Amino acid sequence: MSQTSFNKAQFQAALTRQWQHFGLQSASEMTQRQWWRAVSGALSELLSAQPVAKATEGERHVNYISMEFLIGRLTGNNLLNLGWYQQVSDELQAHDVNLTDLLEEEID
């Protein structure tokens, strides 16, 4: 599976749209919870803009969903798996926001 690319300019634009959606004049006005919501929304926007890989013809697969346990927080792991953790962290550092602290806002 190929690595999904991170676009810094698109992330910055998506982040700006998120804090403007809150009715704020600048990102510096956001609370920690608003930062969490803004980053989550921006990441969702970036991922939904990624092209969907086409399945190989004739290829079959099985999807299995288990409700046996709750797996907890996933954003940090997903950023690591995408190879985006450091880039997102760097972008947030420009706003004096620590990604590790921000990930604590995620609800279990």
Curated annotation (Swiss-Prot):
It comes from the Bacteria. The keyword Magnesium does not apply. Its cofactor is pyridoxal 5'-phosphate. Phosphorylase is an important allosteric enzyme in carbohydrate metabolism. Enzymes from different sources differ in their regulatory mechanisms and in their natural substrates. However, all known phosphorylases share catalytic and structural properties. SUPFAM superfamilies: UDP-Glycosyltransferase/glycogen phosphorylase. Transmembrane segments: none annotated. Its EC number is 2.4.1.1. Belongs to the glycogen phosphorylase family. Keywords: Allosteric enzyme, Carbohydrate metabolism, Glycosyltransferase, Pyridoxal phosphate, Transferase. The gene is malP. This is Maltodextrin phosphorylase. Gene3D superfamilies: Glycogen Phosphorylase B (3.40.50.2000). GO terms for molecular function: 1,4-alpha-oligoglucan phosphorylase activity. It catalyses: [(1->4)-alpha-D-glucosyl](n) + phosphate = [(1->4)-alpha-D-glucosyl](n-1) + alpha-D-glucose 1-phosphate.
